[in-house]
Regions:
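Short hydrophobic/aromatic beta-strand micro-patches
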Residues: 74-76
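Catalytic core of pol beta-like nucleotidyltransferases
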Residues: 1-54, 58, 62-68, 78-147
Length: 147
């Protein structure tokens, strides 16, 4: 369940489980946000087909900002998962990040990959604000069809 935003417009620290429907209800409060959720749904369907089972959402999308630019996120890498199968969807090169933003409105990274600026894995990096204080993310389990 996605909690209410803090006074700072962030989620309480932790990974808050949600379904796509809960995401629509709680975070789809502007046209821009609903458009981003539609792109996210398309992306999650493709990612699920590549073996992704769990994703974490972050960025301005999981704040009270009415018009977030995109959705940032990361996904758990499952044992034996072929990351190359993700290439058509999420090229792991910074040169192609704009393509995933344009196609889906989202940017995803492997959760255990280190974010260069912070030196932390993306999942840890996403759970801190710019000042280093803890904040929340949305966690989604992909089981079969995305719903």
């Amino acid at each position: 369940m996605i909690p209410d935003f803090t006074d700072e417009g962030l989620l309480l620290p932790g990974a808050h489980e949600a379904t796509l429907e809960e995401l629509r209800e709680k975070l789809g409060f502007s046209r821009r946000r609903r458009d981003l959720i539609d792109g996210l749904e398309r992306a999650l369907t493709l990612m699920g087909g590549c073996g992704v089972r769990r994703v974490y959402l972050d960025g301005s999308f999981v704040t009270d900002k009415p018009r977030p630019g995109d959705i940032d996120g990361c996904y758990d890498v499952e044992p034996g998962m072929d990351l190359q199968s993700m290439y058509p969807i999420w090229p792991l090169s910074h040169l192609n990040r704009a393509r995933s933003r344009a196609a889906f409105g989202v940017e995803f990274f492997p959760a255990d990959t280190v974010e260069a600026g912070s030196g932390q894995p993306f999942l840890q990096f996403f759970q801190r604000d710019r000042e280093g204080s803890p904040k929340g993310v949305v966690a989604m389990e992909l089981r079969g069809e995305v719903r």
